Amino acid sequence: MLLGVNIDHIATVRNARGTTYPSPVEAALVAETHGADLITMHLREDRRHIKDADVFAVKNAIRTRLNLEMALTEEMLENALKVMPEDVCIVPEKRQEITTEGGLDVLAQQEKIAEFAKILTDAGIRVSLFIDADDRQIQAARDVGAPVVELHTGAYADAQSHAEQIRQFERIQNGAHFAGDLGLVVNAGHGLTIHNVTPVAQILAIRELNIGHSLIAQALFLGLPEAVRQMKEAMFRARLLP
């Protein structure tokens, strides 16, 4: 199983004081060295954390691959074609939200998503859609030509009871298997921590987890190398469990 380390909140800390540190590039390189299989960055329309220059700098520095999260807008499409990341994950975006609140509604935007997916694919960029684990959305993702889906794990991570967490986990598990049966590559992420990652990492249909906020939070106490190492180890151990 692959670990994508999202470095958005390195930029959040930097921007809080308007300094040049901590460096997203340095964070990306440290994460790579200690187990990250790819680096994920979300260039939001309001540029609240990652800036355009960060994306270019990280793309040019890393040895693994860049997964660029972006909204379904012409501006972001143009940026992606300039940066040429290995992967683009199209996500829903609202300016007033603190973080991404739900999955992309592919059913409501099939024509536009299909257009973007074709342009990116023709440019050699692999397209992923960040969606809820809903069979209709998963089928729509396949129909618009996206080869990859990233299942939104936020409801699982935020569940307020054990029963609700189990319900949300089963939804993710079933969605992952359904997507896999359709021939889609399945990733997952949002809200995952060292404490809740094990069940999700046990789902064999899921190839990759993208994790950011909790890793950066752990890094405040452990250091980024150890935070990445521990997460990677937790994912590895999960795959060994029966």
Curated annotation (Swiss-Prot):
<feature type="active site" description="Proton donor">
    <location>
        <position position="190"/>
    </location>
</feature>
<feature type="active site" description="Proton acceptor">
    <location>
        <position position="69"/>
    </location>
</feature>
<feature type="binding site">
    <location>
        <position position="44"/>
    </location>
    <ligand>
        <name>1-deoxy-D-xylulose 5-phosphate</name>
    </ligand>
</feature>
<feature type="active site" description="Proton acceptor">
    <location>
        <position position="42"/>
    </location>
</feature>
<dbReference type="GO" id="GO:0033856">
    <property type="term" value="F:pyridoxine 5'-phosphate synthase activity"/>
</dbReference>
<dbReference type="Pfam" id="PF03740">
    <property type="entry name" value="PdxJ"/>
</dbReference>
<protein>
    <recommendedName>
        <fullName>Pyridoxine 5'-phosphate synthase</fullName>
        <ecNumber>2.6.99.2</ecNumber>
    </recommendedName>
</protein>
<keyword id="KW-0664">Pyridoxine biosynthesis</keyword>
<feature type="binding site">
    <location>
        <begin position="212"/>
        <end position="213"/>
    </location>
    <ligand>
        <name>3-amino-2-oxopropyl phosphate</name>
    </ligand>
</feature>
<feature type="binding site">
    <location>
        <position position="99"/>
    </location>
    <ligand>
        <name>1-deoxy-D-xylulose 5-phosphate</name>
    </ligand>
</feature>
<feature type="binding site">
    <location>
        <begin position="8"/>
        <end position="9"/>
    </location>
    <ligand>
        <name>1-deoxy-D-xylulose 5-phosphate</name>
    </ligand>
</feature>
<comment type="function">
    <text>Catalyzes the complicated ring closure reaction between the two acyclic compounds 1-deoxy-D-xylulose-5-phosphate (DXP) and 3-amino-2-oxopropyl phosphate (1-amino-acetone-3-phosphate or AAP) to form pyridoxine 5'-phosphate (PNP) and inorganic phosphate.</text>
</comment>
<comment type="subunit">
    <text>Homooctamer; tetramer of dimers.</text>
</comment>
<dbReference type="GO" id="GO:0005829">
    <property type="term" value="C:cytosol"/>
</dbReference>
<comment type="pathway">
    <text>Cofactor biosynthesis; pyridoxine 5'-phosphate biosynthesis; pyridoxine 5'-phosphate from D-erythrose 4-phosphate: step 5/5.</text>
</comment>
<dbReference type="InterPro" id="IPR004569">
    <property type="entry name" value="PyrdxlP_synth_PdxJ"/>
</dbReference>
<dbReference type="InterPro" id="IPR013785">
    <property type="entry name" value="Aldolase_TIM"/>
</dbReference>
<dbReference type="InterPro" id="IPR036130">
    <property type="entry name" value="Pyridoxine-5'_phos_synth"/>
</dbReference>
<feature type="binding site">
    <location>
        <position position="49"/>
    </location>
    <ligand>
        <name>1-deoxy-D-xylulose 5-phosphate</name>
    </ligand>
</feature>
<feature type="site" description="Transition state stabilizer">
    <location>
        <position position="150"/>
    </location>
</feature>
<dbReference type="GO" id="GO:0008615">
    <property type="term" value="P:pyridoxine biosynthetic process"/>
</dbReference>
<feature type="binding site">
    <location>
        <position position="17"/>
    </location>
    <ligand>
        <name>3-amino-2-oxopropyl phosphate</name>
    </ligand>
</feature>
<feature type="binding site">
    <location>
        <position position="6"/>
    </location>
    <ligand>
        <name>3-amino-2-oxopropyl phosphate</name>
    </ligand>
</feature>
<feature type="binding site">
    <location>
        <position position="191"/>
    </location>
    <ligand>
        <name>3-amino-2-oxopropyl phosphate</name>
    </ligand>
</feature>
<keyword id="KW-0808">Transferase</keyword>
<comment type="similarity">
    <text>Belongs to the PNP synthase family.</text>
</comment>
<keyword id="KW-0963">Cytoplasm</keyword>
